[in-house]
Amino acid sequence: MILFKQVGYFVSLFATVSCGCLSQLYANTFFRGGDLAAIYTPDAQHCQKMCTFHPRCLLFSFLAVSPTKETDKRFGCFMKESITGTLPRIHRTGAISGHSLKQCGHQLSACHQDIYEGLDMRGSNFNISKTDSIEECQKLCTNNIHCQFFTYATKAFHRPEYRKSCLLKRSSSGTPTSIKPVDNLVSGFSLKSCALSEIGCPMDIFQHFAFADLNVSQVVTPDAFVCRTVCTFHPNCLFFTFYTNEWETESQRNVCFLKTSKSGRPSPPIIQENAVSGYSLFTCRKARPEPCHFKIYSGVAFEGEELNATFVQGADACQETCTKTIRCQFFTYSLLPQDCKAEGCKCSLRLSTDGSPTRITYEAQGSSGYSLRLCKVVESSDCTTKINARIVGGTNSSLGEWPWQVSLQVKLVSQNHMCGGSIIGRQWILTAAHCFDGIPYPDVWRIYGGILNLSEITNKTPFSSIKELIIHQKYKMSEGSYDIALIKLQTPLNYTEFQKPICLPSKADTNTIYTNCWVTGWGYTKERGETQNILQKATIPLVPNEECQKKYRDYVITKQMICAGYKEGGIDACKGDSGGPLVCKHSGRWQLVGITSWGEGCARKEQPGVYTKVAEYIDWILEKIQSSKERALETSPA
């Protein structure tokens, strides 16, 4: 019998690997060795998700079936680590193995919406209610502060007294304590991690107050904000108290106490100097933090197990080295004279059991911070995080200001700008499907990047050709969703100061509130205008879909769409901007939030523009890119 350890898998989200994004699963394969912990999960995808958010897990093996003498191992999720990023593989029927998605920022999401028919996910049953449907049961779980997963007995369940019963459950790990096949039972998880809870979102931070409730765990953090992020992703933390470096008890300095209570609310706070308290944000619909921390702390040293030390120029370079180094969770960059050479100063790469520093010291000559691996949102680490800062009511852009913008042009008798697009990888452009209505022929298209003025394009101007045009299989018209297309280029782009990719959002960003958004393009600057020579830009506010729907009563504004525009009109995307980017700056990064799709006229009052919501299509984008790579490998010479 195996020992299933009850571990706080979300204590830290700062573990890293450096072998690139490996999302494929290996059937009938089991990784040997490297054991970290074992839990129960209903399928391999959920096992992979748990591995991703475990501080040290790099690989996993899941047993979909088990030998008759080891039935307790069925649904076992075995989390593993490896210094090299790989482990020996053995054949085992029914086993499914794979990699953590820590290095796949675009796929990072704690949300798990799948429903499992015929399974009883067991745990501590703390509430039982009668409901009419599985959906209602899942909603009850999502809106109960303690519920982590649930089981619903259908009307065909063999015991009449339990039919249509909804059992709300929890465990110390946030995962089932066992899973058993049972007919007419259906199980699933709370959707709090999908930002669908209606509980509310207390964001208060209480300076000089402490909560005296039950501690579920503790970690070392540099400030209360990292403490809050750790609490948010811990399965049982509801609120926290953090003691600063000035706290009187030395052993508790920089300690983040993760707390809970039976009622789900903290007891009245106690006045304590140098204590900071607050709430988990896991019930928030709009303000969930990212599972990473960008800040570099000057004059601070993070202690932990040392992986490696190298010499680099500056703390930013040290953070980048940590991000790219296998297993590095945090780092310290030393400026001590004995730690500096001609090529740079010492960068110590470190890790710990829970992914947080084991100790933090101050007045150090240097600085410290965390790996940014889980902050990455695109396949390429080259996506643009910093820039120098159809558009009706817009202004001229400057060269290199929007380096992901491309012009899609058609060469027939003459050559004309038709649509915009966005660079998302060295060989990939994202644009709108409707750009190819009537012109679905790759050979007639030319793609220009790194340009500002269309008039600068001559016969000698380099351009990219289309190798593969991938229009969403469900696309019919722009007003009906799925207005998205991928272009694979014949040859990879060279990234320059003026030609770089934009970061893609993650699936978890579907409910993010963006406040700094821009549209760009060479399209008309008025409804009956003409294509502009200079790339135009305009800042534009997002409009809630509910409000947008009221403006377009003859259309359906779906969750795959996002609206933007001013109530009074005057600024909008227009003809020629189609397929171009709606970008927003969030947490220090520019993200491709929307693709210019359709609207009623241009910049009309009470008529916002409608954009394809990129976060809703991340899986589709990644699937098509991966499929293209696999086809290329199959056709390449041996």
UniProtKB/Swiss-Prot annotation:
Its main location: secreted. Its EC number is 3.4.21.34. Keywords: Blood coagulation, Disulfide bond, Fibrinolysis, Glycoprotein, Hemostasis, Hydrolase, Inflammatory response, Protease, Repeat, Secreted, Serine protease, Signal, Zymogen. It is an enzyme of class 3 (hydrolase). Residues 1-19 form the signal peptide. It is found in: Secreted. GO terms for molecular function: serine-type endopeptidase activity. The active site is at residues 434, 483, 578. GO terms for biological process: blood coagulation; fibrinolysis; inflammatory response; liver regeneration; plasminogen activation; positive regulation of fibrinolysis. GO terms for cellular component: extracellular space. It comes from the Eukaryota. SUPFAM superfamilies: Trypsin-like serine proteases (SSF50494). Belongs to the peptidase S1 family. Plasma kallikrein subfamily. Forms a heterodimer with SERPINA5. The zymogen is activated by factor XIIa, which cleaves the molecule into a light chain, which contains the active site, and a heavy chain, which associates with HMW kininogen. These chains are linked by one or more disulfide bonds. This is Plasma kallikrein. It comes from Rattus norvegicus. The gene is Klkb1.
